[in-house]
Design a protein with these regions (language model features):
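An N-terminal hydrophobic leader/cap segment in hydrolases
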Residues: 144-182
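Conserved small/polar residues in nucleotide/adenosyl-binding loops
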Residues: 198-200
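Signature of short aromatic-glycine-proline-rich micro-motifs recurring in repeat-based ectodomains
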Residues: 81-90
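Short loop/turn segments that connect beta-strands within beta-propeller blades
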Residues: 13-17, 60-63, 111-115, 155-156
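Hydrophobic beta-strand positions that form the internal "hydrophobic ladder"
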Residues: 44-45, 95, 137
């Protein structure tokens, strides 16, 4: 499956619509590639799990793969459905992203020039389908106690507004179990991360 291993290829589209100059870029049997995107400046970015985590990479001017921001978190996810996006370009130098640590999504701004990640205070723990402009980012969001919603982040003020809820049912947070992050050993000395509901 693509979350186990897949390949990223690049080609040029001729005036007649044919693909030309097709070449392999990254990936393979044991490397998963997620969400290839062209930056506004025409640089190819993508997430790769080559270091054990889906981290953001890009192709340099010399054609080499560069790690953009190494972290022990996921900037990617299994593609159970198509069209998911965990990051979006607000500009050449700013990426809005949702990186996952211990099974929980964290909304953040990645400053490409200064290599700094600014986490945004956010009530949501599941953030997907990010899209961005120079002023705003929109995304689908939810949490164990919040119904799914479309939310908007103001990139200047960092304010998050809920634009639309999936339904208008009243939610009572006390009725819901809150999952806890867990980790456990797996094969080859690796560690798996997830969420657990513990009932006592």
């Amino acid at each position: 499956m693509p979350w186990d291993g897949c390949e990223l290829w690049v080609g040029e589209v001729s005036p007649e619509g044919a693909l030309e100059n097709i070449r392999w870029v990254a990936g393979g049997t044991h490397e998963s590639i997620f969400q290839p995107e062209w930056s506004p400046a025409g640089v190819l970015y993508f997430s790769s799990d080559r270091n054990g985590w889906w981290n953001l990479q890009r192709i340099s001017d010399a054609g080499q793969i560069e790690s953009v921001f190494p972290t022990k978190g996921e900037l990617g996810m299994p593609q159970w459905v198509f069209g998911t996006s965990q990051y979006a370009f607000a500009s050449d130098e700013l990426i809005v992203c949702s990186h996952i640590k211990q099974g929980v999504s964290q909304l953040a701004l990645l400053d490409l020039r200064n290599q700094k990640l600014e986490e945004i205070d956010c009530p949501f723990t599941d953030i997907q389908y990010l899209r961005a402009t120079a002023d705003y980012a929109v995304f689908r969001a939810g949490s164990p106690t919040e119904v799914a919603a479309i939310a908007r982040l103001n990139l200047e003020t960092k304010r998050i507004d809920t634009l639309r809820l999936a339904n208008d049912l009243e939610v009572f947070p006390a009725y819901f179990s809150i999952p806890r992050p867990i980790e456990f050993p797996t094969e080859a000395g690796l560690t798996a991360h997830g969420l657990s509901l513990i009932h006592i």
